[in-house]
């Protein structure tokens, strides 16, 4: 509730409190702290928290979750070096949806970091295959918008950006 209300000082005091320290493991508290820094757009402290958490020896699923979260953050920050390191780790994941996740992360890296536009046909195919999956459609439309922007096609950029925004509102409704 404190995070939703953006009452950051109280939130920080609660996380640092004795009772919270006794009830919740350090990783969970630090992960919550990371999320609060991301919401605050406090990039310096978010970077520090990512460095701390990524340096821990974590169970596989926690590691996968954290690495993908960090990758998305650093791609959004256009941090080529950290994005590339995390993408390399993501490509090493095994099991479940690992291959599909790695492929989508590669598309994000190519689009947002390398500013490529050569994946438009593939992204359009993937969008058709997404069907009624609004979350996936939103993500793919956003990548398509950026690829068209990278290509210099302002009309298509605006078209897919608007579609992505509509799906985003439907997902968050």
What kind of feature is each model-predicted range?
Residues 1, 22-31, 59-68, 95-107, ...:
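Generic helix N-cap/helix-start motif at coil->alpha-helix transitions
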Residues 1-62:
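N-terminal topogenic membrane-targeting module
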Residues 2, 14, 49, 67, ...:
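Amphipathic coiled-coil alpha-helices
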Residues 10-18, 43-55, 79-94, 116-131, ...:
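Alpha-helical repeat scaffolds
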Residues 23, 34-36, 46, 83, ...:
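Small-side-chain structural scaffolding
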Residues 35-39, 72-73, 109-113, 147:
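Residue-level signature for tetratricopeptide repeat
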Residues 60-84:
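A membrane-cytosol interface segment of integral membrane proteins
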Residues 103-173:
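Extracytoplasmic/periplasmic C-terminal soluble domains
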């Amino acid at each position: 509730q404190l995070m939703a209300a953006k009452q950051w000082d109280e939130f920080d005091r609660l996380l640092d409190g004795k009772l919270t320290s006794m009830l919740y493991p350090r990783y969970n508290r630090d992960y919550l702290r990371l999320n609060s820094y991301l919401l605050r757009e406090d990039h310096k402290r978010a970077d520090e928290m990512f460095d701390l958490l990524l340096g821990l020896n974590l169970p596989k699923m926690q590691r996968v979750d954290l690495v993908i979260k960090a990758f998305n953050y650093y791609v959004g920050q256009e941090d080529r070096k950290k994005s590339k390191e995390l993408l390399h780790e993501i490509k090493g994941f095994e099991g479940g949806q690992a291959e599909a996740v790695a492929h989508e992360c590669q598309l994000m890296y190519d689009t947002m970091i390398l500013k490529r536009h050569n994946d438009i046909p593939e992204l359009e195919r993937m969008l058709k295959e997404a069907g009624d999956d609004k979350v996936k459609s939103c993500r793919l439309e956003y990548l398509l918008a950026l690829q068209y922007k990278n290509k210099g096609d302002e009309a298509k950029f605006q078209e897919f950006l608007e579609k992505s925004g509509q799906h985003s509102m439907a997902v968050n409704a």
